[in-house]
Amino acid sequence: MACLLETPIRMSVLSEVTASSRHYVDRLFDPDPQKVLQGVIDMKNAVIGNNKQKANLIVLGAVPRLLYLLQQETSSTELKTECAVVLGSLAMGTENNVKSLLDCHIIPALLQGLLSPDLKFIEACLRCPRTIFTSPVTPEELLYTDATVIPHLMALLSRSRYTQEYICQIFSHCCKGPDHQTILFNHGAVQNIAHLLTSLSYKVRMQALKCFSVLAFENPQVSMTLVNVLVDGELLPQIFVKMLQRDKPIEMQLTSAKCLTYMCRAGAIRTDDNCIVLKTLPCLVRMCSKERLLEERVEGAETLAYLIEPDVELQRIASITDHLIAMLADYFKYPSSVSAITDIKRLDHDLKHAHELRQAAFKLYASLGANDEDIRKKIIETENMMDRIVTGLSESSVKVRLAAVRCLHSLSRSVQQLRTSFQDHAVWKPLMKVLQNAPDEILVVASSMLCNLLLEFSPSKEPILESGAVELLCGLTQSENPALRVNGIWALMNTAFQAEQKIKADILRSLSTEQLFRLLSDSDLNVLMKTLGLLRNLLSTRPHIDKIMSTHGKQIMQAVTLILEGEHNIEVKEQTLCILANIADGTTAKDLIMTNDDILQKIKYYMGHSHVKLQLAAMFCISNLIWNEEEGSQERQDKLRDMGIVDILHKLSQSPDSNLCDKAKMALQQYLA
């Protein structure tokens, strides 16, 4: 059967491969070098703009032969150059073409060609990898495999405007992350590329600008250097500002704004600098206008969101610039009408990419509403905004869902909105759906937002708990992702705050004592702190304290002992002592402290600690244990006096810290009463 099946498959492939395509490849093997050269030139003309022909030639094995000719010392420079040109043309086809070229190890061969003294050949050898590296299927690491390549490319920057354009383009596509930035920076990228910003060639200026944007992104070292670079007597930020003026091409305005944004976010330019407030921010707002192309609006909104994200003043300025909040509402109505876009190709492109606009709008709304209550109110009052966000939570695109959750999370920081809009639109329902099955990046933001919805004043708290939130959150605490563990335990902490005994019992049952112990020994400090916060909230109000300690007392006391003995910071120890103070406030629970000499000695030790916070927390424990109005107080006071606690209280009553002094005096009063 296998033999019978093979024939039609081979026939279908071969039917695609025309006789003329075979003829082109056959000529590459001619013994006459002139005929080979002419064959390569004819092949070059045949493949221009013809993807089918490119695919045919690749299937017929043209690539290995072209690479062989390119690397042969006996080949003339003209032949080598033409081979590089054809390979560059083949790379401009489909992604499959690029994969085929990569499989033939084209990059090392072309980079080797850069050692030639011939400029035309060098340019052809650069043009092809420039095309290959711009493809998403090409691993950037191929540029960094040989350590001699980057310094050689830096040296070639001075050869011609084409070497400048292609090399900058290669750098901007292959600079992904801090390791690549460091390599390029250490090989003099800033000094070698800076002067290209004043090149007569627009393409060179543009590629140099793109280089600086990827070099500066989240990189303080590069950004701090860029601020002080002079080009023809002008500082780089001044050059970038000139490049984002309205009379410059949009691509240049946008990329300059990105450079200044990244330098600002990296701490090299102040957020209140005029070049940010009066130039960069207004330029990015302009890019959000509906007159701009879809990709310009997307890039403008996303860059602006990144610029203003940490700074409340920039958020306020942006929110009142050119009616930005209303302008972003248009991102959800795009394209508004078929007649508005006469170019059918453009319409088709925009319909396929309209989700990117929604994603960008959500991102910018999230940044705008991060801090200011009035801005959040304006966003929510924008037409159908809550409905749009809720719809965004169930979009097929993961990126849109993530941006919608982030936007909702930003708005959920408002007490007012949690009580009104979030309740009116039952936001918790789609959010719980998102939490059932989503990638980690969405889960982190969605669970963080759930923490806000579970705050005690939120009307959504009750229905969320009724829909099985406790179990879901306990599941998150077992995640390998520390951010999810933190959010799971944080949300449980909020749930336990002033909760009924039944909810607290549900939490302890679903979480299990074993998991609680695991969380208390978690290597992530945030997880530990939130777990202590949860315990503190569980152990509040006397009946609850006594009930929980009657069933889990032994394990909780064990955990407290371990933490107080461990190498933990002041905040962790303070929280732990506060838990002890809560236990000491129980009616029967306090016996677990009084019968544990080890714990009593630890409380005594922390009363004499050098840190006031720990002394105060230990004082709360003592005050709760000796309070006069409670049964058995006399025996407890006597035992603590025998331990030397009263002497310590006398010392603390002389403390320069007024709070500590008052608490000590109040405790001593209990002995005198």
UniProtKB/Swiss-Prot annotation:
Subcellular location: Nucleus; Cytoplasm
Gene Ontology biological process terms from the UniProt entry: proteasome-mediated ubiquitin-dependent protein catabolic process
Location, primary (coarse class): nucleus
PANTHER family linked to this entry: ARMADILLO REPEAT-CONTAINING PROTEIN 8
PROSITE patterns: ARM_REPEAT (PS50176)
Disulphides: none
GO CC annotation, single: cytoplasm
InterPro entries, alphabetized: ARM-like, ARM-type_fold, Armadillo, ARMC8/Vid28
Protein name in UniProt: Armadillo repeat-containing protein 8
ARM repeat start and end residues: 51-92, 95-134, 138-176, 178-217, 224-265, 269-309, 313-352, 374-413, 416-455, 458-497, 501-540, 543-585, 588-627, 634-673
Keywords: Acetylation, Cytoplasm, Nucleus, Phosphoprotein, Repeat
Modified residues (Phosphoserine): 337, 512
Record's subunit section: Identified in the CTLH complex that contains GID4, RANBP9 and/or RANBP10, MKLN1, MAEA, RMND5A (or alternatively its paralog RMND5B), GID8, ARMC8, WDR26 and YPEL5. Within this complex, MAEA, RMND5A (or alternatively its paralog RMND5B), GID8, WDR26, and RANBP9 and/or RANBP10 form the catalytic core, while GID4, MKLN1, ARMC8 and YPEL5 have ancillary roles.
PTM-bearing positions, type N-acetylalanine: 2
Biological function: Component of the CTLH E3 ubiquitin-protein ligase complex that selectively accepts ubiquitin from UBE2H and mediates ubiquitination and subsequent proteasomal degradation of the transcription factor HBP1.
